């Protein structure tokens, strides 16, 4: 067993980057990739990801967890499709209440203090990874599908990208005392939903060359 665990949410993303390893096997127990790191698949969304990552960390001792995946970038944040970013801070973007006028109020606003989840200092990373662009992420259960929601979420949280597991990964790793980092490759702009414009294979190729090959 290695000291670093590389965690994926999606079996499809994992299969693209590690075609030689069964995603089904990696979802049940971490698989070693030589002497470099172990890999695992924890499931899409905060619930599956947090439960499965917690299960793995309760059985195996890792000093460091690196989460890899794709993400959407919000409009107007000067982030390009295919760009690799390091998500250092996350908030949960759709946890809160709706008031009588139909307006969404974030949970942090309700309790009077922001609820922020953070990764560890990039100074703990190899120089190549420490120099990757740092961004703020929003973890959601329902992905943005309109330009209106994209601008609203990015403005409300001053956020750059949208994920479905980032906050969960940070929270679980902190609980288990493992240092944690999250890298994402932008596959699309989170705006009016148009899957024909998505560049998932290209984003995953960038993730491999810029992150995996530099671990």
Protein language model annotation of sequence segments:
Residues 180, 185-215:
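Regulatory input/activation interfaces that engage signals or partners
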Residues 75-157:
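Mid-sequence, gly/pro-rich, charge-dense loop/helix-turn segments that line enzyme active sites
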Residues 140-191:
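A C-terminal functional module that forms or caps the active site or interfaces directly
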Residues 58-63, 176-178:
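Glycine-rich phosphate-binding loop signature in dinucleotide/nucleotide-binding domains
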Residues 3-7, 66, 85:
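Conserved beta-strand elements of the Class I
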Residues 1-55, 59-60:
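N-terminal short beta-loop-beta anion/metal-coordinating cradle
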Residues 63-65, 160-161:
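Conserved acidic residues
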């Amino acid at each position: 067993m290695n000291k670093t665990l590389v965690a994926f949410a999606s079996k499809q993303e994992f299969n693209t980057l590690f075609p030689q390893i069964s995603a089904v096997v990696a979802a049940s127990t971490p698989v070693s990739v030589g002497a470099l790191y172990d890999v695992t698949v924890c499931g899409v969304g905060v619930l599956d990801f947090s439960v499965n990552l917690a299960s793995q960390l309760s059985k195996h001792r890792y000093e460091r967890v690196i989460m890899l995946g794709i993400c959407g970038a919000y409009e107007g944040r000067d982030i390009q499709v295919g760009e690799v970013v390091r998500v250092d801070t996350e908030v949960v973007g759709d946890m809160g209440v709706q008031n009588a006028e139909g307006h969404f109020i974030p949970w942090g606003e309700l309790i009077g203090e922001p609820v922020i989840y953070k990764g560890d200092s990039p100074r703990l990373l190899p120089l190549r990874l420490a120099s990757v662009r740092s961004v703020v992420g929003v973890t959601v259960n329902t992905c943005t599908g309109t330009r209106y929601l994209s601008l609203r979420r990015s403005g409300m949280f001053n956020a750059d990208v949208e994920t479905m597991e980032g906050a969960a990964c940070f929270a679980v790793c902190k609980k288990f005392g493992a240092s944690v980092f999250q890298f994402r490759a932008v596959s699309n702009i989170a705006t009016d939903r148009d899957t024909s414009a998505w560049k998932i294979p290209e984003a995953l190729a960038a993730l491999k060359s810029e992150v995996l090959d530099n671990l």
